[in-house]
Amino acid sequence: MRLPRLLRTPPPAVAVDITPRHVAAVEVSGSRAGGFLVIRYAVQPLATGIVVPSLNASNVTRPEELTQALRSVWERFGHRPRRVALVVPDGVAKVSFVRFQQVPARVSDLDELIRFQLKKAAPFRIEESQISYSKGLETVEGQQFVVVQARRDLIGEYETACQASGATAGLVDLATFNVANAVIAGDPTLRDDWLLVHVTPGGAALAIHRGRDVAFFRHRASDGDGGLGDLVHQTAMFYQDRLGGSGFSRVLVAGGTRADGAQTARVTIETRLGRAVEDVDPMKAVGFADRSSLPPDLVDALTASIGLAIAQRTAGTDGDV
């Protein structure tokens, strides 16, 4: 069911991205038809160890310092937003793909079916989880759903820091999904298969897309088994063997200006895939009100928050999920 537009709560205009290295926030105005404009932005560095992404351990080890960083961002904004959309690191959640030949008509039945599927390989108790899902690819084998599962208390650590700074997190999403949102907003004609590699100080995430749909996602922490080269190779094999892929139309890399060993990461990806890669450029999706020339590392830091802010501006315009 879709609510009449006048009865809907307006989505947050501000998106904030919390990473192990910084807090970045943007406020976006505009529309898909008229174009999007960043009217405010701010980035506040974080000291090492304040945020440590983890699936099963505390993520925010020094909450007072994270709260202060958020307050500093609002000071640079010139005002404190009451509600924000929040981007958290990929490492705090598990992303799964489930497929059903027949999708239940009732949302409550679909909820239960997805929870039942997750119990088979859940990294923690379902009762302790915060779960969200959205429609993915639809094929002759059925309807696929992209499911995100995280411990409720760990997501709560990020939400609590926002609340303590004076801003309520009205929505929470993962970093790489919103880097992809920025890519799609900058090139809405994307139809073919493309690969996104999101390199961060704490690891890397790879996502295969078919047009706007996520077909594969894998995150590996920097202390996990194997390096980026192995992850790229495994992803390429999955693409060929399981997805029947015939080749990526584009390979895009984000995070390369901020991550340790960024140039090495680019060479690794190009060597493994045998083709050149492109940098994600969120400037294709938005303009900036101050018309300044932004350094690449700043643009890189703002990418995920730009992606989520745009997604919020367009929420509800493409039909219900």
Where in this protein do the model-derived segments appear?
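Hydrophobic/aromatic-enriched cytosolic interaction surfaces used to assemble or bind macromolecules
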Residues: 1-321
